[in-house]
């Protein structure tokens, strides 16, 4: 049904803080399956009844960094182009794995990376040093194909792994929600940074 709402919480029990992601579908009548996400920063009441004065906050720490994530059956690299936009990159190894295990991701017959970079909106939140909550939207995918997701995940850059969830619709237009985890490795994305974007987001 639309609008549909998904709520995900990141609980920081060390600092008694919380970041909530409110993801939804159906806000845009032109693209009813387009995901949207709002982040809200709050606090957890301490046993003595007090609330900490500080909150989690947006960060530019990830800007210019890129990570090749291994999700088990496929690899995909997230390139954090700026503090507000990300790009997707496919390493040669990732392309081989995708074509072998999940060729539909690349349009079936494609054997090489796109000449332009897919880019879209993101928000990054610093939980503490090396630990970030990241929200990625697939709004441009939705405009092109009629469906998309909001990915929200907690990323540990000291141990190079993440855990998160997807909220949105699949290629058949059905509601899609799943959880995921991945191991990451730093990726040299200089070429991806320099590529023209499909949608020219700057």
Residue ranges, per PLM feature:
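N-terminal glycine/threonine-rich, aromatic-flanked beta-hairpin/loop signature
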Residues: 1, 74-125
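Short, hydrophobic/aromatic-rich segments at coil-to-beta transitions
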Residues: 1, 61-67, 83-87, 128-134
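A eukaryote-biased signal for long
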Residues: 68-75, 80-81, 107, 148-202
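Hydrophobic, ordered structural segments
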Residues: 2-45, 142-181
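Beta-strand residues in well-ordered beta-sheet regions across diverse protein folds
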Residues: 21, 70, 89, 135, ...
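Surface-exposed beta-loop interaction hotspot
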Residues: 19-71, 186, 190-202
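A cross-kingdom feature marking solvent-exposed beta-strand/loop segments within repeated
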Residues: 1-6, 106, 114-121, 125, ...
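Short, exposed beta-strand/loop patches in secreted or surface proteins that constitute
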Residues: 9-11, 58-60, 76-81, 122-126, ...
């Amino acid at each position: 049904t639309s609008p549909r709402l998904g709520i995900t919480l990141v609980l920081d029990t060390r600092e008694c803080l919380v970041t909530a992601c409110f993801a939804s579908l159906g806000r845009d009548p032109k693209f009813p399956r387009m995901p949207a996400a709002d982040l809200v920063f709050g606090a957890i009441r301490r046993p003595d009844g007090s609330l900490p004065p500080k909150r989690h906050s947006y960060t530019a720490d990830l800007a210019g960094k890129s990570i090749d994530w291994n999700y088990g059956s496929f690899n995909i690299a997230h390139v954090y182009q700026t503090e507000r936009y990300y790009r997707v990159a496919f390493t040669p190894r990732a392309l081989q794995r995708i074509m072998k295990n999940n060729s539909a991701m690349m349009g079936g017959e494609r054997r090489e990376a796109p000449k332009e970079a897919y880019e879209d909106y993101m928000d990054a939140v610093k939980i503490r040093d090396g630990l970030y909550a990241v929200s990625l939207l697939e709004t441009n995918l939705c405009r092109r194909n009629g469906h998309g997701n909001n990915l929200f995940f907690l990323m540990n850059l000291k141990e190079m792994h993440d855990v998160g969830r997807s909220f949105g619709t699949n290629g058949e237009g059905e509601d899609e929600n799943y959880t995921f985890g991945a191991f990451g490795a730093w990726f040299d994305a200089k070429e991806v940074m320099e590529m023209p974007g499909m949608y020219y987001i700057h």
